[in-house]
Structures are given as C-alpha cells and as structure tokens.
Amino acid sequence: MESYIKHGDCLKVMKDIPDKSIDMILCDLPYGTTQCKWDVVIPFDKLWEQYCRVAKDNAAIVLFGAEPFSSRLRLSNLQMYKYDWIWDKVKGTGFLNAKKQPLRNHEVICVFYKSQCTYNPQMTSGQRKVSYRRKGLQTDVYGQADEDYIYDSAARYPRSIQVFSADTQKCSLHPTQKPIALLEYLIRTYTNDYDIVLDNCMGSGSTCIAAQNTNRKYIGIESEESIFNTAKDRIKMNKTQLQLF
C-alpha cells in the first residue's frame, strides 16, 4: 500500500481501507471543547468500529486528549485501553481563567491495542554501567531476591512524561497542531520502517510529515477542505526537501 491523503468524512473514507492493514493509528481527535466548526466529537461507537477493522491486532492506537474528553475516550473502549503518556507542552494555556484555576501545560496521549503492540523504547543517555553483588533480601511482596545485581544505566528507558515544545513559533497552521518531533517520537516507538500510520483527522498534515521523516508510509484524512489543501501543500514540500537531502 502506498502513502496517500484524502479529503472527506473519516468514517466514510476509512471504509475504503482494507481490513487489518494499518500498523499504527496516531490521531488528534476533535475534543469538542470549542465552538470551532471542525471541533465536533466523532461518535465513539462508529469510530471504534472502523479502528478495530482496519488496525492489525498488534497495532497501537495512539490518541491525543485532554479532560474531559480524555476520560470519555478511555471509557469508550476500556477493554483495549492500556496506559497514558503525558505530554508536557512547556508553555501553559488557559490564561483567561488563570485567577480561577492553574494554567494547563499538558495533554494526555492514550494508548490502546488488542494484543501486545510493537514497542521500541526510545532510549536516552544515562550514567555509566555499574555491576555489583548484593546479599539477597527476603521481602513480603516478592520473596527472596536474587543475590547478583547488574545495574546497567548507560541508556535509560523512557518515562511516561515527555517534554516537547509546540511548533507554533516555527509553523502554526492549525489551532491544535502537534509538534512534529513528538509525533516522530511516537511513530518510532510503535512502528518499524515501512509500516503504515493512519491519521484520520490529519489537520495540517503533521503526522504524515512525521511518517515521511521516519521512513514510514501514511494515510491521512481531513474533512475541512481548506485545511486539507494546506496539508497537501505542506506534505508535498516536505517530500521534496527529503528527496533533496
């Protein structure tokens, strides 16, 4: 399957995607928290019907959210819901209510899957490796502990809170635009080279660009024509730049 983007209602367009052909779904769904025309929550029952049909059994379904939408999202499929990432956006929002409640500088990223998904932890640098021997301990929870310990901290496993600054100062094309670096991080975590990533609410095309940058294939869907055209031009330009370098 080749990469492509399409303008239209995602629930209708997804019907043309073959069964169990998608390796990852990465989407910033409408939260339904604004008066914007496009910010209408997609019916969860119809959404999951298509997600479960097109996604492979080991595909990660990774969806952005914020309260109260994120709670509704988890409850819409508790059987497949596994855990959350927390995206620290660095810059706070909600200044109009700053005297009534704390500024919001994070969003959640909910992870769903049927069976164990591809997981490539993105390691970071740590301290030097240390090996040592320690007397075994008897614990109430785990019983007798092993006596030999190897502390290998040259690389650190990722934690659930990830810090990525927004792209708004570089390129702001959509009100809810997500940083390409964060999308690349998630794509590398849950897919391998040449896997297919679906974004059924692609907005200005950031997920598709992140897929291009990480050597993955993509399918992007957008209902708003003007936003779709922006995404189309942006994706084409990024592809051209990648071919030059």
Language-model regions: role of each:
Residues 232-245:
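Short, conserved SAM-binding/catalytic segment
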Residues 1-229:
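Core catalytic lobe of class I
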